[in-house]
């Protein structure tokens, strides 16, 4: 395990030196028990164990992509243009900067040929480590088997057709997963009216500020308060005032 951790750390360092954009934002896990009790867990995605698994997975996907690229085989390659702006270097960003940096990332692109993935700092990338859950990963593994003479090779046209057929449905799945998590998070907060919690100011709008509740890593609006000037990255205390999960409403006030 120690050796694997050293390999993972060196690989991450190499990616960062190649311009990777490392986003370090806590993950919020919403768990619904059989009795409909909702539990919220805040997970550190940068714990040693999670970092090791993440980096080794990225390495495996990169090595697979490099093999396919070297052998000039079509595959579902992922690339990503440079972000619209960089807010920090390597892993130096604050929670505010990491959250805002994620908003500035360019959308990833799926193609049959390898191109640079700026977000990961790699010259080629595919996903291949979850063939049971993800069809794209299964297609990648089939291409590897084809390279070994174990089954027919997908042509570039067939790969492109797969991308066109599944890209939109997969995008819809991601939106549904986000909406489901936010719904149950708000459902939990419906029972926390009057709770005080810390928030970070993200931006100012005409009639309110956009803030993120640190404990729950979710955004909401904070009404402007007379005589109080808030700037992005300010830390404030707010009180949960009203929540309606079905209508996607979360209201808070200062104090």
Identify the residue ranges that each predicted region occupies.
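Electropositive polyanion-binding surfaces
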Residues: 1-251, 255
């Amino acid at each position: 395990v120690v050796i694997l951790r050293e390999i993972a750390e060196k690989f991450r360092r190499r990616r960062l030196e190649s311009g990777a954009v490392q986003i370090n934002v806590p993950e919020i896990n919403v768990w619904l028990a059989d009795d409909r009790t909702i539990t919220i867990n805040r997970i550190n995605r940068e714990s040693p164990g999670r970092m090791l698994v993440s980096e080794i997975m990225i390495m495996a996907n990169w090595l697979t992509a490099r093999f396919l690229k070297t052998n000039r085989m079509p595959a579902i390659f992922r690339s990503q243009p440079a972000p619209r702006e960089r807010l920090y270097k390597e892993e130096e960003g604050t929670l505010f900067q990491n959250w805002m940096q994620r908003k500035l990332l360019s959308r990833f692109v799926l193609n049959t040929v390898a191109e640079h993935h700026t977000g990961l700092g790699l010259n080629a990338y595919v996903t291949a480590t979850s063939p049971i859950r993800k069809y794209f990963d299964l297609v990648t593994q089939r291409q590897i088997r084809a390279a070994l003479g174990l089954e027919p090779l997908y042509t570039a046209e067939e790969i492109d057709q797969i991308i066109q057929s599944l890209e939109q449905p997969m995008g819809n799945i991601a939106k549904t997963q986000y909406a489901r998590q936010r719904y149950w998070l708000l459902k939990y907060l419906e029972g926390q009216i009057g709770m005080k919690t810390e928030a970070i100011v993200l931006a100012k709008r005409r009639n309110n500020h956009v803030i993120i509740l640190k404990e729950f890593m979710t955004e909401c609006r904070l009404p402007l308060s007379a005589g109080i000037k808030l700037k992005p990255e300010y830390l404030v205390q707010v009180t949960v005032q009203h929540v309606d999960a079905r209508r996607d409403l979360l209201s808070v006030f200062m104090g």
